[in-house]
């Protein structure tokens, strides 16, 4: 099993396969046009950023099955408050900030609901619904399962920078914390994920020895 995580991504766009700068310029333009009442621009804005929002909330909530509902909630919130968006940050950074709040609110609602059975525990749900064989991981190791082992703040920082390709500055704005805090959380997340991969490899070798 390959126990090496993807190389860290910093603030340089060259480290990200997609041209994030160009994409952000276009999507931000659509958001501003939508704010002015352009319905076609609003549709284009949603289509352009839907995938990033779904990926973000799926990893952050550790519940892939809830991702579409959380993404829909995010876009509804964004469209209701679009008149406040002035383009000082990219539309994607602004939208992911809203997505984070949607996930946090969902956690709070879930915590307020009484558990009806042991199967309501989110970890059990994660175990049943984990995707396997995700790109970048061999032998069926699921990234979602690994991320579920991380504390919320480290998982958030890792997803924003390493999976969605945000710079540390953009991730800090989305997470509402200093850049240095994001860097520290990403470093600790990578250390923890590497340890989990190595532990899994050791257990596999022990079973087959």
Functional labels for PLM-detected ranges:
Residues 1-32, 36, 40, 44, ...:
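Intrinsic, short, N-terminal disordered tails of RNA polymerase sigma-factor systems
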Residues 45, 49, 53, 57, ...:
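Residue-level preference for hydrophobic side chains embedded in well-ordered alpha helices
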Residues 157-161:
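A short pre-motif secondary-structure segment
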Residues 65, 169, 180:
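Residues within helix-turn-helix
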Residues 80-87, 97-118, 136, 188:
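Arg/Lys-rich amphipathic alpha helix in sigma70-family domain 2
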């Amino acid at each position: 099993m390959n126990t090496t995580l993807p190389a860290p991504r910093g603030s340089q766009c060259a480290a990200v396969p997609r041209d994030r700068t160009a994409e952000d310029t276009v999507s931000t333009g659509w958001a501003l046009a939508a704010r002015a009442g352009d319905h076609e621009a609003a549709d284009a804005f949603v289509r352009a950023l839907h995938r990033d929002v779904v990926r973000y909330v799926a990893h952050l909530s550790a519940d892939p099955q809830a991702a579409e509902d959380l993404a829909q909630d995010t876009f509804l919130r964004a469209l209701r408050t679009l008149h406040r968006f002035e383009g000082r940050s990219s539309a994607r950074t602004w939208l992911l900030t809203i997505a984070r709040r949607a996930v946090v609110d969902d956690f709070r609602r879930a915590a307020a609901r009484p558990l009806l059975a042991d199967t309501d525990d989110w970890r059990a749900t994660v175990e049943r619904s984990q995707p396997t064989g995700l790109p970048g991981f061999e032998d069926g190791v699921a990234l979602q399962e690994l991320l579920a082992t991380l504390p919320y703040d480290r998982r958030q920082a890792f997803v924003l920078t390493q999976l969605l390709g945000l710079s540390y500055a953009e991730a800090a704005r989305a997470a509402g914390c200093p850049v240095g805090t994001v860097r520290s959380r990403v470093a600790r997340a990578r250390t923890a994920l590497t340890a989990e991969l190595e532990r899994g490899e050791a257990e596999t070798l022990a079973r087959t020895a």
